[in-house]
C-alpha cells in the first residue's frame, strides 16, 4: 500500500515542446528522469487529511494517459478518457498521471514521460498516437499500454480499444432523417481517418434507411461512402472558422440536421444554424452533449456516444483491483455491450410521433445487435 500521507494536487507545467504534464501522485515524482520531456513540480500543498477523511484508500497502482492534440477538457474524445482515469482514482484509489499533447511532436516525449514515471498502464488517446504507442510498446516490452482507436502491430503489451461507431451512428442518421423537414441532412469530419468516417458511414446508411422505410427521398451532404469523398476540417481544433464554414455550406445546401464528427464543433454548428435563421438541429458525438455541454442543449437532437470513460475505468479496475493479468486482446465497444449508444432524444419536432420513432429505433438497435441489419450498408 502506497503511503498517502503527503500526497497533494500539483500545478500543471508546460514543457519546452509545448506539452503539458500533470502528476497527481507522489510515486510519479520518485526517481523521476523525464529527459527533458516534461517537468513536474508540486506546489502549494496543504496538510494531508487524516485517513478517515478519505472514502477510498489509495492503492499502489499508477494509471496514466497521454492525450491526442488538444486539452483534456475538449468536451469530447480526450475528456471522455480522462474522466475514466479520474473515475478510477476517485472510486478505486489508484494514482494517476497524465500528459496533454499540444501537437504530434509531443506524442513520443509524452509517452516517454509516462514510462519514466513508472506507470503501471499508459493509455494513448486517439488514432493519431498509434505509431508512437506501438513504438513505445515494442521498445518497452515490460510496460503496459492501451491505444484508444488504434491497433497493435503485434506487441502483447499493447491493448487496442475500438468502437463500432457505425452502429449508434446508423440510429443517429435514421433519427436525423425523421427530424429533417427538408430531408437533407449533413455530416462532416475532423480528419478523413477510419475512426471518423465510421461515424459518417453509419449515419449515411441510417438516413437512407429512413427514406426507404417511409417512401421519401433523403439526401446526405458531406459524405459519400461509395466514393469515400466528403467534407473534412483537416484537424480537430475546436469550433474553428473552417468548421463553421463547412456547416454553413451544408445548411445552404438544404441540410437542417448536422452531425459534426470532429470533437467539439458544436459552437461552430450552433452559430451557423443561428446565423442562417433555420430551425436546425445537430447530433453530438462521443459524449451525451446535451448533458455534458448544456450551452448547446437547445440545438441537440441526440448524440452517438463512444463510451470511453467506462472502457478505461473497466480496464484499470480489472487489473488494479480484480487482479486480472494484462492482455493485448482487442476490446470493441458495440451497442450490445454498451460501449456505444444513442443518447436520449431531445428537441424533436419531426412529423412522425416520437414514441413511434423511439420504438422503431429500438427495433433497429435489436436488428443491428442480431446481425440482421448491416449499418455499413
Question: For each predicted feature, which ranges?
Answer:
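Bacterial N-terminal signal peptides that target proteins for export
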Residues: 19-32
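Repetitive helical segments and hydrophobic/amphipathic motifs
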Residues: 35-36
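Short, Lys/Arg-enriched N-terminal segments with co-localized hydrophobic residues
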Residues: 1-21
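C-terminal motif of bacterial Sec signal peptides marking the signal peptidase cleavage site
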Residues: 39-44
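A residue-level marker of the well-folded mature domains of exported/periplasmic proteins
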Residues: 6-9, 13, 26, 45-377
Amino acid at each position: 500500500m502506497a503511503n498517502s500521507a503527503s500526497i497533494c494536487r500539483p500545478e500543471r507545467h508546460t514543457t519546452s515542446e509545448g506539452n503539458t504534464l500533470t502528476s497527481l501522485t507522489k510515486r510519479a515524482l520518485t526517481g523521476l528522469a523525464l529527459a527533458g520531456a516534461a517537468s513536474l513540480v508540486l506546489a502549494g500543498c496543504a496538510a494531508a487529511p487524516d485517513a478517515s477523511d478519505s472514502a477510498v484508500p489509495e492503492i499502489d497502482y499508477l494509471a496514466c494517459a497521454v492525450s491526442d492534440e488538444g486539452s483534456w477538457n475538449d468536451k469530447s474524445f480526450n475528456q471522455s478518457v480522462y474522466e475514466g482515469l479520474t473515475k478510477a482514482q476517485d472510486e478505486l484509489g489508484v494514482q494517476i498521471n497524465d500528459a496533454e499533447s499540444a501537437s504530434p511532436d509531443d506524442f513520443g516525449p509524452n509517452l516517454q514521460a509516462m514510462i519514466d514515471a513508472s506507470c503501471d498502464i499508459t493509455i494513448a488517446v486517439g488514432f493519431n498516437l498509434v505509431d508512437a504507442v506501438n513504438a513505445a510498446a515494442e521498445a518497452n516490452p515490460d510496460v503496459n499500454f492501451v491505444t484508444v482507436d488504434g491497433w497493435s502491430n503485434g506487441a502483447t503489451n499493447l491493448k487496442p480499444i475500438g468502437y463500432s461507431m457505425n452502429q449508434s451512428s446508423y440510429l443517429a442518421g435514421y433519427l436525423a432523417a425523421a427530424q429533417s423537414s427538408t430531408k437533407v441532412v449533413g455530416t462532416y469530419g475532423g480528419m478523413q481517418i477510419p475512426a471518423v468516417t465510421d461515424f459518417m458511414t453509419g449515419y449515411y446508411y441510417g438516413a437512407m434507411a429512413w427514406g426507404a422505410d417511409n417512401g421519401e427521398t433523403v439526401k446526405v451532404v458531406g459524405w459519400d461512402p461509395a466514393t469515400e469523398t466528403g467534407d473534412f476540417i483537416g484537424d480537430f481544433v475546436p469550433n474553428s472558422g473552417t468548421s463553421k464554414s463547412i456547416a454553413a455550406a451544408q445548411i445552404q445546401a438544404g441540410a437542417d440536421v448536422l452531425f459534426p464528427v470532429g470533437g467539439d464543433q458544436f459552437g461552430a454548428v450552433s452559430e451557423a444554424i443561428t446565423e442562417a435563421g433555420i430551425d436546425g438541429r445537430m447530433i453530438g458525438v462521443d459524449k451525451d452533449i446535451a448533458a455534458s455541454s448544456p450551452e448547446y442543449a437547445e440545438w441537440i437532437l441526440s448524440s452517438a456516444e463512444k463510451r470511453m470513460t467506462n472502457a478505461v475505468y473497466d480496464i484499470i479496475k480489472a487489473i488494479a483491483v480484480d487482479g486480472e493479468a494484462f492482455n493485448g486482446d482487442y476490446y470493441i465497444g458495440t451497442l450490445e455491450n454498451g460501449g456505444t449508444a444513442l443518447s436520449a432524444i431531445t428537441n424533436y419536432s419531426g412529423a412522425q410521433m416520437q414514441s413511434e420513432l423511439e420504438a422503431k429505433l429500438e427495433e433497429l438497435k435489436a436488428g443491428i445487435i442480431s446481425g440482421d441489419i448491416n449499418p455499413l450498408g
